[in-house]
C-alpha cells in the first residue's frame, strides 16, 4: 500500500534491478498485493506529467518481471505531499488504482494549516484520505489527539512495518493501535538498504505485542483497502493525558 519500488521515478529504486530485488523480498514476506506510491508534490510537477512518468516506469518494471517466479496484483497510486490546494487537482488519478483511497504525506518539520478542512474537502469529492507513516510526524507522536480528530473526521492511518522494530517507538505505536488510531501497515520500502521491506518482521512484532487477532485485522485491512472495501476500524478511544503521560 506504500512503497517506492518503481524504478527511477523518485528517491526509491534507482533501476529495475533494485526494483526486482525489493519485489523478491516482499514476495518472500508473503506480500501479493502492491500499490506503487511514488512521491507526488504539486509544487514540483503536474498530475499529468507525474502519471505519464509513473506509467513509463511501471511498463519498464513489468517488462523486467516477465519470466520471474513471482505473481503480484499491482495498482498505481502516489504518496501525495499535503497541500490545501489538493482539492483543485485531479486527485482521482493519484488514488490507488481504481480505489477511492489517497495516500497523504504530511511535513515532518511542522504541522501544516488547514488539515481538517482539506480532509473534509477530499471526502466531499469521494476521496478517502489515508495518512502515511504517522510515526514520522513529531507533532502527532507528541499530541495524539490531533490524529484522533482526523480519524474521527473520516481519515485512516498507516504505519511503517520497520517502525515496529524500534522498541521505544513500537511501544508508542501499540498505544495508538489500542486507541483505534492505526488501520494498516506497509513497508514504505525505498531500497534494500534504505528502509528495506520488513513486513513479516513487523507483523510478528504486532502479534507479540498485541496478539494475533489485532495483527490479523490490520493485515486484513490492507487487503480490504487494496480492493476498495471498507476497513475494519477498531473502536476509537480519545487519548487522555494523565500525570504527563498519554493513556
Where do the model's predicted regions map?
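An N-terminally biased module of ancient metal coordination in phosphate/nucleic-acid-related enzymes
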Residues: 1-71
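Mid-to-C-terminal alpha-helical segments outside catalytic/metal-binding sites
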Residues: 203-247
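Short acidic, glycine/proline-enriched helix-loop-strand junctions
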Residues: 45-54, 62, 68-73, 194-221
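Extended substrate/RNA-proximal surfaces in nucleic-acid metabolism proteins
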Residues: 45-158, 233-247
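Short acidic/histidine-rich active-site segments
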Residues: 181-197
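Non-catalytic positions within long, well-ordered alpha-helices that form the structural scaffold/packing
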Residues: 27, 123, 177-178
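Active-site beta-loop-alpha junctions enriched in small/polar residues
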Residues: 4-6, 39, 77-81, 107-109, ...
Amino acid at each position: 500500500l506504500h512503497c517506492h519500488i518503481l524504478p527511477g521515478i523518485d528517491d526509491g529504486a534507482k533501476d529495475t534491478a533494485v526494483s526486482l530485488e525489493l519485489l523478491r523480498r516482499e514476495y518472500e514476506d508473503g506480500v501479493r498485493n502492491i500499490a506503487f506510491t511514488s512521491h507526488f508534490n504539486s509544487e514540483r510537477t503536474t498530475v499529468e506529467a507525474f502519471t505519464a512518468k509513473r506509467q513509463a516506469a511501471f511498463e519498464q518494471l513489468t517488462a523486467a518481471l516477465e519470466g520471474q517466479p513471482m505473481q503480484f496484483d499491482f495498482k498505481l497510486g502516489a504518496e501525495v505531499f499535503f497541500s490545501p490546494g489538493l482539492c483543485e487537482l485531479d486527485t482521482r488519478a493519484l488514488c490507488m488504482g481504481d480505489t477511492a483511497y489517497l495516500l497523504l504525506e504530511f511535513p515532518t518539520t511542522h504541522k501544516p494549516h488547514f488539515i481538517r478542512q482539506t480532509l473534509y474537502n477530499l471526502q466531499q469529492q469521494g476521496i478517502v484520505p489515508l495518512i502515511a507513516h504517522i510515526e514520522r510526524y513529531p507533532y502527532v507522536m507528541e499530541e495524539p489527539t490531533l490524529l484522533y480528530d482526523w480519524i474521527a473526521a473520516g481519515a485512516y492511518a498507516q504505519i511503517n512495518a520497520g517502525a515496529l522494530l524500534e522498541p521505544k517507538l513500537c511501544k508508542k505505536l501499540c498505544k495508538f493501535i489500542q486507541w483505534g488510531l492505526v488501520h494498516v501497515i506497509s513497508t514504505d520500502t525505498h531500497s534494500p538498504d534504505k528502509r528495506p521491506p520488513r513486513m513479516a518482521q513487523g507483523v510478528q512484532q504486532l502479534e507479540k505485542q498485541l496478539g494475533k487477532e489485532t495483527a490479523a485485522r490490520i493485515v486484513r485491512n490492507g487487503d480490504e483497502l487494496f480492493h476498495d472495501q471498507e476497513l475494519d476500524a477498531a473502536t476509537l478511544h480519545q487519548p487522555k493525558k494523565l500525570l504527563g503521560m498519554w493513556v
